[in-house]
């Protein structure tokens, strides 16, 4: 042994004090320090508020992303205790408030006191103290017993003692924090991720209002999640745009004694005419993605209840056809939720519930309710049974089709499917497969690829829309069969094996036209419905071939999007131009001109935010009344004409008072200060937002250093932008690519396939509920929801982006 080697004895054992352990090993407490861990911080704080709601003391939670990137979570619960904590004070030799204990000591909180919380989601008791430890800045405010209190921390350490702010009529807790950039790879909160979880919590906790606001986006309306129907509303939401077999979801609720106290069970279910099963399970509001005893008990009871009803009423269609749980769950949408005093989760991530007593409670309550429901509703029961038998027959047909496909694949395994051009590398981690639209582009991709690790699979035309097809039809589709065989990982719940995937990057490469978009959507629908693990594990990517090639003399560049092209042309046009305001003779050039141009672009962003709410800008301008523009819009009920504009917060409150249901329908057109700031900045130049479309009277003369180009007078702000873009076009050659086949092999490699230069979009699943909703609406059988979606988004489409 090296004499210099340090001795490993008791002196080498380090004890991390307080929250230092959390900062040293954050992954042990929040999973990771990436996007998932960042949002987990918010969930930990929100869960505390929801626990207050579950205990009956809180009715509203407000989550707000601040303009500067911080986030606040407030509730109207009891408020964290602020009295002196005698035990911890004696231990540390100074007076310490209960608030400081909760925020700085691991495994401290009311959740271990069964008199305070019978059930809670924050099982480990490390939540809010972890958030404090991993925050650069953390401020807690408590509103309790008529007084407001505050305490500030940084990276888990107190910066102040408990401060008394003064009297208040509020009650509850407010937490404001800024994640520590020294810990997290990103500190930018994703609105979609947060909204998914908040919507879920509102469904699971009937009667609790959860408000979400995002101050970073001036065009974003606050969202209010409130569902009086609870998980019944959740099932109805999931079945939106689907053809349901009966009107109202079946609902069951009950409580039974468990090993550690009463177990509360709740479930709602409803069948639709589709082919996908959609079941979400929860324990103490925590998603149990791998199920557990509560889901097993429910599924067992469901299968038994259906089979018993068939047997009792002699409804069997064939002695040779045995029904499975898979048949019964085809087209089923269900939510299963339990509240357990002492939940036992398998693994730190709480993905699976393990309490054995929960399974028997779940099975007992489900069985009783379903048996009674089927007997009392024979017509609905018969409709369900008919669907189950059709599903069983389709399963047998799909099994035969699968076996035929597998036999064919085995015979063809030496050369793999059809036109697959495989790569030399055999390690899946290093391999990628391009799914390419058309033989022409496939040929260019074959010539341009790096054959060591890039495989090419050309597909012809539009593949089957699997949203409208049973599994046997999927197996019979030639293009889908080629994809299944090429990937090698199988298909379907029972036959999919991710470890057999031959390429860890599957890249969809289609044309930039409407057909290309349609093919891409069909492929994504297939992967989402039948190989969802590929999306969950982020194996699917979308290639970003350029839309334009711009050349000037010998120089050229590729441009990916219409927005990038507009910016490029505007930048070129602005560089060598100057403007003169004809009324004041004030001239702008260089940075001063860029500032003015950027201000006009802010006006355009404001217009886009209005049009996303289906408010035409010209109509908005016409609504100018008594020196003010409208602040809110109250849309008409579905199918009716004529909405109304509201000009103040008082008018909005009056509308809500007259009709409480209007609260969720009233749109905030913009944050109050946004338009005010725009008008002030435009006023510095003698303009206002009306002048984007309407002339002021005097013009703006644009000139360049090029003597061949005469000065041009613009009379609206829009005209200034359009003219500068036009100047940017002079002297350059623009080629717009409509298809991949228009690029040669070298161009395709340089722009879309070279790992050093290409841009890929990774397909991830942030919100499974919303993804299901969108795929059903856009790709499903029901036409009216799709028409309504298209009509409501029509104003957001730029005419030059339409492929007509």
Swiss-Prot record:
Q: Which metal ions or organic cofactors does this protein require, according to UniProt?
A: Mg(2+); Mn(2+); Ca(2+)
Q: Do you know which CDD domains this protein is assigned to? A: HATPase_GyrB-like, TopoII_Trans_DNA_gyrase, TOPRIM_TopoIIA_GyrB
| Source species | Chlamydia trachomatis serovar D (strain ATCC VR-885 / DSM 19411 / UW-3/Cx)
User: SMART domains per the record?
Assistant: HATPase_c (SM00387), TOP2c (SM00433)
Instruction: State what this protein does.
Output: A type II topoisomerase that negatively supercoils closed circular double-stranded (ds) DNA in an ATP-dependent manner to modulate DNA topology and maintain chromosomes in an underwound state. Negative supercoiling favors strand separation, and DNA replication, transcription, recombination and repair, all of which involve strand separation. Also able to catalyze the interconversion of other topological isomers of dsDNA rings, including catenanes and knotted rings. Type II topoisomerases break and join 2 DNA strands simultaneously in an ATP-dependent manner.
Alphabetized GO MF terms: ATP binding; DNA binding; DNA topoisomerase type II (double strand cut, ATP-hydrolyzing) activity; metal ion binding
**Recorded catalytic activity of this chain's protein:** ATP-dependent breakage, passage and rejoining of double-stranded DNA
Q: Which residues of the sequence carry a binding annotation for Mg(2+) 2?
A: 511, 513
UniProt family annotation: Belongs to the type II topoisomerase GyrB family.
Official protein name in the record: DNA gyrase subunit B
Q: Is Ligase included in the keywords of this UniProt record?
A: no
| EC number(s) recorded for this UniProt protein | 5.6.2.2
